[in-house]
Amino acid sequence: QPDSALLDAELTKGLPAHVTAATGIDAMVHAIEAYTSVHKKNPVSDMLAKEGLRLLSSNLMAAVNEGHNLEARSNMLLGALYAGQAFANAPVAAVHALAYPLGGHFHIPHGLSNSLVLPHVMRFNAADKQAAAQYAELAPYIMGADFSETSAGISDEEVTNTLIAWLEQRIKETGLPMRLRECDIPEDAVPMLASEALLQQRLL
């Protein structure tokens, strides 16, 4: 095990835009799933998740579109660190459970796998009122200034729906694929992917 990790943004300046986008969304998923985890959720992981999301969400597009923007790159690294510390204390869940077989069978990069299923898992989870309330709590950290313009006086469910739509739009703006078929995954593979996701009992 390493004794330390150095977050040097200079080393990430050459990272391609699509890799920056996928790894950035992956880090956001770490924080979102840690905050909404039914296993070991705690005040420390919550704090780390929220601050990680604030940094990641507010710097993702700058890092994607301006690869040499060291401030954005540095903030992405710090946000990813916080998100990693969050899910080290409160584990990830269904997004990752679904992402693993996508990578294992179709060699989809891990960050992209998470990005493909994130909105759909959130929409499914939001049928539960507690999950919707937790997503709503994260909305201002993810949406930033966009949150105050859209959220006044609406329910947790409506805030969550707005947040999911916001995330889908942001993923689209990064240029990442949005659908499984865009990654050449056939429809008849879906039952197998779902079955294998259910085997990830440590995450569900």
Residue ranges and their predicted role:
Residues Q1-A90:
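Carboxylate- and glycine-rich phosphate/diphosphate-binding segment that chelates Mg2+/Mn2+
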Residues H18, K40, C183, Q200-L204:
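Short, flexible active-site recognition loops that position polar ligands and cofactors
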Residues P186-L204:
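Short, amphipathic C-terminal "tail helix"
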Residues H105-A189:
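Gly/Pro-rich interdomain helix-loop hinge
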